[in-house]
Amino acid sequence: MKKKRMEIVLSAGLALAFSLVFYAFNTPLGASIGSDNAMYLTLGTALANGYAPYTQIFDHKGPLLYLLQAVPQILSGGYSTLAVFIQEAVVLFACLMVLRAMAREMGVSAWGVQLFYLALICSLTGGGNLTEEYTSLPTLLALYT
């Protein structure tokens, strides 16, 4: 039980450290809003404020992405890059937990699998808050089941 708890704490620390470095668009260390990120934040905030997607505010992405962007805005009560950062870190932590479970079933080091995964996705994060990081969780869950 103690080893399991320690693995979870290490995974949470790994998710937080990775997020602080690679999710630069919304990091509390000094957010720098990127182009796609800015659009997602704008649409998420608009949905949180009751705007209708595709009629009152428009972008060409699917509605699920904007609903994911509305959640942190609703929970924070307004336009918040910190709330999006927390959501990103939680999604990454969930991905690491799925990878941990997969590694344990295969009898390999969870820590090694998680580090390998992070090394692969660091080039895909593009500053964070992009579709790639949100699609990783359902993809990993599909691979696990």
Residue ranges, per PLM feature:
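Start-transfer (signal-anchor) and selected internal transmembrane alpha helices
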Residues: 1-24, 104-107
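Aromatic-anchored segments of alpha-helical transmembrane domains
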Residues: 19-21, 118-123
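Extracytoplasmic loop-helix module adjacent to an early transmembrane segment
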Residues: 22-59, 71-74
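Loop-to-helix entry region of an early transmembrane alpha helix in multi-pass inner-membrane enzymes
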Residues: 63, 67, 76-94
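Transmembrane-helix signature of polytopic, membrane-embedded enzymes
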Residues: 90, 96-121, 136-137, 141
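Short acidic/glycine- and proline-prone juxtamembrane loop motifs at membrane-interface regions
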Residues: 125-135
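Structural signal for the C-terminal ends of transmembrane alpha-helices
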Residues: 143-145
